[in-house]
């Protein structure tokens, strides 16, 4: 199937006015050995964007044509051909640890604490708490709702609750990543505002009861899915290799100004890691500044 689809897509890609660096990245990604699922993840949205581009060209709709090309540029260099940063891989590796230690706020306990705090609501759900706090301290409490499967206990070579150096690196890198995106809201996908990342456990009824444990456990799973999607799919950091590749596009003297500006718009949300090779110090992030005439 992949070879048949590529036979249709590759000539269309070559006919677009995109820079050769983007065309090579696209071609390499499509023709590399991968599962049908991974191939479809790229081929389906790419086909849609190319169809939009061709229709816009036939209608001589310049705006729609440029929008389709912008989408292809962004998806190629930021998503399809962009290696995940180290803390994304560690997120997957230590998923169960994050699931059982992800910070939460139990509304039942919050209501009960009002009397103790002289009628004041002592909430930890505000973004300011997450921006100022040491994230390791926020992860110190293990939640009682997520159960560890026996199979995971048998397979694990380390204590599932131990704050290993790798897990500390992961948590602090996630904290830096979240704080960076909050501080640079112009980078967010669809101008999305990031709420507090803690799990909120609501009161179920007027009696103050909360949901069953299984439903609460699902809240943690959904929140981690949301966090992963926000940091690594919708707003992924640009890899150092891709940053260099795009810099080469911007500094290519043969590129027309209109095409350079197209790339500028497509890459306006670019940011990358300052210390991508670090394995001890948590990752830091900075906005990418493209110098374009």
From Swiss-Prot:
Keyword line: Mitochondrion
Location(s) in or outside the cell: Mitochondrion
Cellular component terms (Gene Ontology): mitochondrion
Entry annotated with the keyword Mitochondrion: yes
GO biological process assignments: mitochondrial genome maintenance
Highest taxon above the source species: Eukaryota
Pfam family of the protein (one): GEP5
Protein function: Essential for respiratory growth and required for maintenance of mtDNA. Required for cell survival in the absence of prohibitins.
Family as reported in the entry's similarity comment: Belongs to the GEP5 family.
This protein's name: Genetic interactor of prohibitin 5, mitochondrial
Organism (species): Saccharomyces cerevisiae (strain YJM789)
Organism lineage: Eukaryota, Fungi, Dikarya, Ascomycota, Saccharomycotina
């Amino acid at each position: 199937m992949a070879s048949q689809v590529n036979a249709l897509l590759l000539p269309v890609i070559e006919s677009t006015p995109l820079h050769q660096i983007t065309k090579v990245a696209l071609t390499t990604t499509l023709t590399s050995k991968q599962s049908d699922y991974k191939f479809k993840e790229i081929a389906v949205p790419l086909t849609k964007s190319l169809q939009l581009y061709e229709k816009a060209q036939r209608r001589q709709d310049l705006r729609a044509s440029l929008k389709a090309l912008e989408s292809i540029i962004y998806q190629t260099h930021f998503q399809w051909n962009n290696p995940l940063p180290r803390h994304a891989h560690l997120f997957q590796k230590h998923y169960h640890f994050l699931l059982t230690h992800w910070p939460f706020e139990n509304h039942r306990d919050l209501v009960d604490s009002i009397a103790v705090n002289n009628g004041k609501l002592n909430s930890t759900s505000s973004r300011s708490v997450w921006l100022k706090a040491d994230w390791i301290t926020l992860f110190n409490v293990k939640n009682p709702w997520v159960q560890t499967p026996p199979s995971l206990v048998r397979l694990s070579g380390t204590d599932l609750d131990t704050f290993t150096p790798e897990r500390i690196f992961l948590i602090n890198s996630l904290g830096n990543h979240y704080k960076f995106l909050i501080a640079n809201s112009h980078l967010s996908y669809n101008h999305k505002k990031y709420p507090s990342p803690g799990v909120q456990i609501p009161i179920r009824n007027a009696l103050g009861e909360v949901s069953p444990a299984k439903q609460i456990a699902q809240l943690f799973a959904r929140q981690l899915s949301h966090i992963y999607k926000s940091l690594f799919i919708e707003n992924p950091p640009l890899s150092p290799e891709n940053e260099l590749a795009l810099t080469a596009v911007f500094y290519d003297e043969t590129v027309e100004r209109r095409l350079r500006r197209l790339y500028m718009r497509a890459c306006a949300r670019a940011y990358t890691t300052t210390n991508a090779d670090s394995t001890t110090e948590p990752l830091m992030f900075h906005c990418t500044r493209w110098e374009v005439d």
